[in-house]
């Protein structure tokens, strides 16, 4: 029998993706799935694609229901995880997909999320230097944001190698509508989204901005300032992030590619594509993979790194499973796939 798992907030898109991955995981057993608005309903009524779990019934999101599990995944709206987490036994492995424990700076939390900062947990981006060792000994893990994962994996090796300047970083990233959650919003109606792209939270106000800056500043060893513009794209899932920065003197395209290759040559889920092959979201769907490609714009003196990932998998549920695998001592790739389902 595998580790007993609870998923809080399992009726949402990230929660549903967690259920899909848990059902196929040889070392995890779903003990309970909770959903405040769907308590008492069968999982199959909300997630008809989850045939193996269709008859299991959603429980209320109650700490007493979650406390018996060995592993608890929190897939709750931002600001709701802290209260639940405080009631769970210290022996349980808790992975929070929300933002409650990602930021180290309470002022940044107050500015971008509001309310009281709940604290900081071990940051669960395994591909960062030293992260696996910290994750392996932790029982509380904060899963990174989806945009943050794409931007950090694209640029962190360049900052670590001191190849780019810290004060001229521009990230423009398009995401599918599932990144906005499952609750009804007028701007997510099919008639509003189909055939249209829309920028939103422009001008440094998106809540992932301080998290991106936190990660890149850590890699650089000095403060990094980022201009981040998110775009809502007419597709259900996937992120394509175009990340640019100003190179330091003497840096060329070969140095950029070498830094990325050196950082990720042994990584199971980060793939630097062959030269001139550019990332596309469709190639990553359903997988825990990130696809990267880089270019050097000599005329504009800009480094360009493009990243593609599935926002629900490597950007959320898949990364949570990856973190749990590390913390539980399982092979890191257990229950996860590197290959997408395109076309």
UniProtKB/Swiss-Prot annotation:
Gene Ontology cellular component terms for the protein in this record: cytoplasm
Pathway: Amino-acid biosynthesis; L-arginine biosynthesis; N(2)-acetyl-L-ornithine from L-glutamate: step 3/4
Keywords: Amino-acid biosynthesis, Arginine biosynthesis, Cytoplasm, NADP, Oxidoreductase
UniProt enzyme class: oxidoreductase
GO MF terms held by the record: N-acetyl-gamma-glutamyl-phosphate reductase activity; NAD binding; NADP+ binding
Principal location listed in the UniProt entry: cytoplasm
Active site location: 146
Tagged with keyword Mitochondrion: no
GO biological processes: L-arginine biosynthetic process
Function: Catalyzes the NADPH-dependent reduction of N-acetyl-5-glutamyl phosphate to yield N-acetyl-L-glutamate 5-semialdehyde.
Family: Belongs to the NAGSA dehydrogenase family. Type 1 subfamily.
Protein name: N-acetyl-gamma-glutamyl-phosphate reductase
Designated gene of the protein: argC
